[in-house]
Amino acid sequence: RPLSAESQMKALKKYRWPLTGALLGALVFLAVYGVRVLDPTSGGWILNNPSPDPAQHYLGWELFRRSPVHLPYIGANYNAVYPFRTSVLFTDSLPLAALLFKLLGGVLPARFQYFGWWGLACYMLQGGLAQAVIARIAGVQPTVDRSSSKATIGVIMSPQQTAKLWGSVAGAGLLVLFPALTMRMFAHTALAANWLVLLALYLWLRS
């Protein structure tokens, strides 16, 4: 029985998600920075960093989490330059994450950092979106295996398409090794979201 259009689209969407590039990003991150940075209670790698910026991000967060809340200034930090009010924005402490974890402050340990996981997410998004962008530019076009039953919908590719797919994986590998990403994550953690440029490109190509 022929596959419905909906079933075909589901099969292709499952196939297209570039998990390989995201996995490459995770492996490169762990190879460069190690597993210790993912420990939420480990702040030594931040405070002992040769660059002062990561310490600024972390200390800004620690002061913000202990700062009183006076509506409507939910992002205000009253501890950083007491007695004056400043904002968590100015310490580059990843404000959205800082706001989220401030809400969870009652269950968090006394020392808590989320910058290691932020870095891992940046590397994975860099790899995944890089593969998605390159695959779209290269014209990777998998097709549904119509001989499969509905329960085992598959995807088939020509040798040329397979080569293009592996080329997109190689390209993703190069972009997760991008020196600017490594430098930003190491010295200016809040600026490591290079993947935002790739996301913009991907959305433009999709349109």
Predicted regions and their residues:
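Membrane-embedded helix bundles of polyisoprenyl
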Residues: 117-137, 164-207
